[in-house]
Amino acid sequence: DIRYTFADTRTQIFLGNLIQDAVRFDFTQQLGLRQEMGDKGIVATSLVFNVMPVELWSDPFATGVDRSSTDVKSKGARFAWDKIWGSNFYGNLTTREVDMDEERSGQQYDQSHGTHYADLLDRNGKMHDMELSYQWHFGGNQLLEPAIVYKQARLDGSAESFKNTGLKLTYAKRGPQWSFVSNLYTGKRKYDEANPIFGQRADADEFAINGTFFWHNLFGVN
């Protein structure tokens, strides 16, 4: 990411994707301001958006045909507070609008069965994310960060709307030549309503683990 800091006011302008987002495979871009508040921590506010649209099936329930893909775009705002009141607590809140170019979920099924399920399966709408974490720093430039994660999808289709609650544990180690970051996540997802095509909710227990290795100054470039 690109950053510029005004030394007198300790105000920073930033643009790009933060490394803590990238290691979670969240490539949302940010344009915003970050301000040091003395011993009260660092607050930041930013616009969030995706430069490269994500591709999904326009109708994931279509069968017997070649499915077509569609782009998903999102934009919104994020507020973050690092080192809350001088502590090792970190928090952020993100809200964004999700817009699909061609949302056709359930349309083929409706045409074949004479139903009216498409509105319940609409994936356009709003997403809200909250995270509260605590950082432990210990010997050898190592970091351990447990976090509570909450996500709510208030989508136009009630059968696609859901709430996520989870726990995440991040471990990081930084060396002079390389760095390593790993994440362990477990959570639950509960949908507001049953999927009308399958007659049941797609509630799920979630588990994820990932690791990212960084090599500094590759080919001598800083």
Tell where the protein language model's regions lie, with residue ranges:
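Residues that define the transmembrane beta-barrel architecture of outer-membrane proteins
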Residues: F25-Q29, D71-A77, N124-M130, A159-T165, ...
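Outer-membrane beta-barrel translocator domains and adjoining extracellular loop/strand segments
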Residues: R24-L31, V54-G64, R96, D101-L120, ...
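Outer-membrane beta-barrel translocator/channel fold
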Residues: S46-D99, N183-A208, N222
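Transmembrane beta-strands of outer-membrane beta-barrel pores
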Residues: F6-D8, N17-D21, L47-P53, W85, ...
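Transmembrane beta-strands of outer-membrane beta-barrel proteins
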Residues: T11-L15, G41-T45, S87-L93, Q142-I148, ...
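Solenoidal tandem-repeat scaffolds enriched in leucines and small polar residues
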Residues: K75-F138
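Residues on the lipid-exposed face of transmembrane beta-strands in outer-membrane beta-barrel proteins
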Residues: I2-Y4, L31-Q35, A77-K83, M130-W136, ...
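Outer-membrane beta-barrel initiation region
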Residues: D1-Q12
